[in-house]
Design a protein with these regions (language model features):
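Short helical (or helix-break) motifs at transmembrane helix termini and adjacent helical loops
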Residues: 151-161, 224-236
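Interfacial loop-to-transmembrane junctions
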Residues: 236-259
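Re-entrant/interfacial helical elements at transmembrane boundaries that shape
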Residues: 161-162, 234-238, 261, 266
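Membrane-embedded alpha-helical bundles of polytopic integral membrane proteins
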Residues: 1-218
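Juxtamembrane boundary at the C-terminal end of a transmembrane helix
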Residues: 268-275
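Hydrophobic transmembrane alpha-helical segments of multi-pass transport and channel proteins
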Residues: 218-226, 253-261
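Hydrophobic side chains within alpha-helical segments
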Residues: 20, 56, 156, 231-234, ...
Length: 275
């Protein structure tokens, strides 16, 4: 009965998650398709929310204006990439690392967390902006990445919650299981292959075969799961259930995109190497 109760709760939570994703996904994909300043505004809005949630999770630098400083620097890095270039944007990221570390040191806060924040929050969104800006394959690369990460996230949660296998990392995230990890990564591979095959048919996929899509889907699925586990560790450390409350069934925005934060830079590197 207890196992049945857990399964019903899991399915109920899954229904809320699925409804949230179903409502948001078409809008996000439409914005990716439009690109240009609309996609830039989506990233800019996201980075403001993510910077605020990161400060909530880690305590930030401890300065009275810590949140505002981080938000301004994070937004400034995206604006630098948009108006000037990615080298200039990375200079702003480096400046943000220095400022956050200095403020944390002065307030005797956790300097490594404060310094890592700009890298963790800003670089993935710069990677998404760079990916979308690639000629011909830009839209396909971002759409493929989103579909793979969404697949591993949804099916890891569903499979892990229903099969009740051995715990993956009980001291970090008691709800995560080996079945969820394997199921989520497998579904990421399938999504990568299917999406890759379609994108190849319209010449919008950067890689040459659909089987490469499967292999990369598995790889991105693993990196997304690592990102999910990393955020779970941080929440456990700070004794918080969610990074925020903005998305029903998911908590904060960071809870929804934690896998994307690790997989987007990896995808950008792969596309850069192939290109």
């Amino acid at each position: 009965m207890a196992a049945l109760r857990v399964s019903l709760v899991t399915l109920s939570d899954f229904a809320v998650r699925t409804a949230s994703t179903a409502a948001l996904a078409p809008m996000i994909l439409f914005i990716v398709w439009i690109g240009e300043w609309v996609f830039f505004l989506l990233l800019l809005t996201s980075i403001v929310l993510l910077a605020s949630e990161w400060n909530r999770l880690t305590g930030g630098s401890g300065a009275a204006f810590s949140n505002m400083t981080f938000v301004v620097l994070a937004g400034g890095s995206l604006a630098s990439a948009w108006f000037f270039g990615y080298i200039e944007a990375l200079v702003v990221v480096a400046a943000a690392v220095g400022v956050e570390a200095l403020l944390a040191w002065r307030k005797k806060r956790n300097v490594p967390f404060a310094a890592f924040g700009p890298i963790y929050i800003i670089v993935p969104l710069l990677a998404l902006m760079w990916l979308r800006g690639q000629p011909v394959v830009g839209i396909g690369s971002v759409v493929w990445l989103f579909l793979v990460v969404w697949s591993t996230d949804i099916f890891a949660y569903l499979i892990g919650g229903t099969l009740h296998s051995a715990k993956l990392a009980p001291s970090i995230s008691p709800g995560k299981t080996w079945a969820g990890l394997i199921g989520g990564v497998t579904c990421a591979g399938l999504a990568g292959g299917i999406a890759g095959a379609y994108l190849l048919s319209i010449e919008a996929f950067v890689f040459e075969t659909w089987s490469t899509g499967i292999q990369l889907g598995i790889f991105i699925g693993v990196t997304a799961q690592i990102g999910d586990l990393g955020e779970s560790w941080l929440k456990r450390l700070r004794m918080l259930k969610d990074s925020g409350r903005i998305i029903p069934g998911h908590g904060g925005l960071l809870d929804r995109v934690d896998g994307l934060m690790t997989s987007a830079p990896m995808m950008a590197v792969l596309v850069w190497v192939v290109g």
